[in-house]
Amino acid sequence: MKKQVRSYILYLFLGFGGINSCTIREDDPVIPSSQIVVEGYLFAHKPVSIRLTESSPFGVDSAVWVPDLQISLESSTGKKMVLTYSGKGEYMSKPTEKIEGAGTRYTLTLTYKGKEVKAITTIPEKPKQLKASSSKMIIPQEIIQGENENVIGIGSSTGGSKGPSLSLSWLNPESNYYSVKIVNTSVNPEPIRVLPPGFLLDNLVGQIPPNQRNWMTLYSDQFYTYGRHALILLRLNTDYVALFDTENSTSLNLKTPPSLISNGLGVFTGVNSDTLYVDILKK
């Protein structure tokens, strides 16, 4: 079965560490170093979840979780959070401890292999005047017959120009970066495209690459199931967007390893959002 890949999780292309010896022969083994990788998205008014892994230059599949570190998260208003380890590299705040609003700056600090790892980010403004051209979209169900190697992952994050569509708009006078995430909130939703036995869609949560527009058109092939969908407009910081090739953005095409985290790699960034709902109905 095709490996499932979650949208916008950063798989980092890692380089080799420094070499201490003064003279190197061709037959000397060179052992690359590992580094800590931070994955932290601070959503305004939400609890905190930060994931830590230890990278390996031998490939992303060999990265391992980093457990039981002491992590401090402090806001510019003076509030401090101590995150606790919950397993699989994830550190969480208490459910009652939430990120503050726009303009609040956060500093993350931890110690890894004797070095202080530090990162700073600011929560951006919430999107304003988010509107949709319709609260519903009617899509005919499609029965896909036979074998087709293109069945897996049907639909796309960028959308096509055929079939029903709806438009989103918002204020963006300063050309800030936005992305839209599409999430079905229904329980056991019915598929729009019925696939042959043994085939599975590899991604039921869609996300549009970051852009600086004040509008977006969503097409029927960007929805995989019927039911109520949350259309989440994300306001993104430029430090996150800069990690990607914006002309062909995916979770796998970082041009260079991130360098905004002192003594570490990864992403630590503030996010703000607004949400609309749309019902996807069968024709």
Predicted regions and their residues:
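Bacterial Sec-dependent N-terminal signal peptides
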Residues: M1-S33
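A sequence/structural signal for flexible, mid-protein segments enriched
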Residues: C22-K283
